[in-house]
């Protein structure tokens, strides 16, 4: 974890806040103390897919917003169900008060993704860059993977081993990998610093297990 220690030191020098750097260090340390299976998981040689959210069944009510107001920002967002089948995550980012992100999230039962290797979802966007994220029991630490959108429907597949750790928005290079057995939350986040309206429509979300 030498790279993470270097990252923490550089962060402290850049923002001039030793207290904040120490707090992030403690949170990353809590991950280091997890059992080794937190970072490694063997896959069975069979294909398996399980639908997690189908928004034709009103499961949008299980989702909630986490915006930059948690740190004083003023970005705005909303969740809607449209056409009785799609969840719309829309709003407008603002960079005021060092803000600039908005996210929509939901919880998952513990170990619900234990036998899976990643996520697959059907979305339609607006040409902007979003990230899919997963969280563990420490919601301040997430694992994220960016994906581009366009105005047409897309099916995106993201393996867990391609996700990278983020601590309160700070990306951690050479971070440990996340595995499905530790995932307790899922979400989407936009943080491209563009102060214009955004809209991401989500049809369904599934967990997948690689075959082979």
Q: What is the role of each PLM region?
A:
Residues 1-4, 18-19:
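Positively charged n-region of N-terminal signal peptides that target proteins for export
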Residues 17-212:
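Beta-rich carbohydrate-recognition modules and glycan-binding surfaces
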